[in-house]
Amino acid sequence: MIFKHLTLFSLVSVMLLGCTCNTNLSEITVACDEAGSQIDLMVDGNLFTSFRYTTDYEKPFLYPIYSPDGQMITRGFPIDPRPGERTDHPHHIGMWFNHGNVNGLDFWNNSSAIQDKTNYGHIVVTKILEAKGGKRAHLKVLSEWRDQAEVVLLEETTDYYITATLDSRTIDRVSTLKAIQDVIITDNKEGLIAVRVDKAFEKPSNETQVFTDEHGNTTVVEVQDSSGANGMYYGSSGKTGDDIWGTRNDWVMLSAEKDGNVISFGFFDHPSNVGYPFHSHARGYGLFACNNLGAKVFNPVEEEILVTLAKGESLTLKHRFYLETGSKVPAERADSIFTAFSGKY
């Protein structure tokens, strides 16, 4: 197994995680609907999120995602479109994990909007290995990354560890990608862990934006009514707003007010990950992504990321998603969340 552009990290100390003033863990219940290819995660009887793995879509994902006070933080389109929200990028669904170039196949941009899927891959869940509730719920999922002939490139084993308090939610995602054949993952901006957010978390904008993927396909993000949009990105680099795109961070958070309450959430990298610290691929129109498998594509002076896995070799990637209601999580506390996560797994 060959990694280019690796950063070593020596963990000197691990701080205790003081996420909220209420640290008592809530009970999480798990409801499995095998026929509907869906697993619901309930906190004190209220839906937090659902793991959806129907083959109607090109990948599994978590959708919807609710804050502890019951506000939806994910965009509804393309599953449940809501009035006034954007309808661009139909491959942005809930929270997901994939990449734009694996053996030349694009897993990121694949959706029902793509007619010729020759150069695209898809992810299929083959087995739910565990679905357990409790104070620390656990989902263990086996998936396959396939080409259009259903030939398997990667076998993915993913552990989701979910905890909740009165005013916070945490998802730790540990994913091991095992090469079923020789695999090359190349430097690409389209990745890696992402969530498409509700309108409240977008940046207000009065400009039409045009984005082009590596296939030359363009997506126009039209100007829309920005009323209610007040999202602000911030990260460990000190960058905020649009300036955070393409920068390296230990963590990136997004905060906004929705229906009178402040909600903050974000992604945390792990020092053991290839490409640590990850690059922010966060856009003001509502894509919130962080990418360990892109470097030069974000910053031309950086060395290109190249991950080569011989058949049977594997790559493990670890990320935390943290969500809190009631305040904008300050940078100092985000640092402590990152440090605590760094000492796990």
Per-range role (PLM):
Residues 1-7:
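Bacterial N-terminal signal peptides that target proteins for export
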Residues 17-18:
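C-terminal motif of bacterial Sec signal peptides marking the signal peptidase cleavage site
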Residues 23-90, 188, 326-328, 334-335:
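Beta-strand-rich N-terminal accessory domains
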Residues 89-167:
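Extended, loop-rich substrate-binding clefts of extracytoplasmic carbohydrate-active enzymes
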Residues 143-147, 160-164, 177-181, 197-201, ...:
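Beta-strand elements of well-folded, non-transmembrane domains
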Residues 189-275:
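Active-site/ligand-binding surface loops and adjacent short beta/alpha elements
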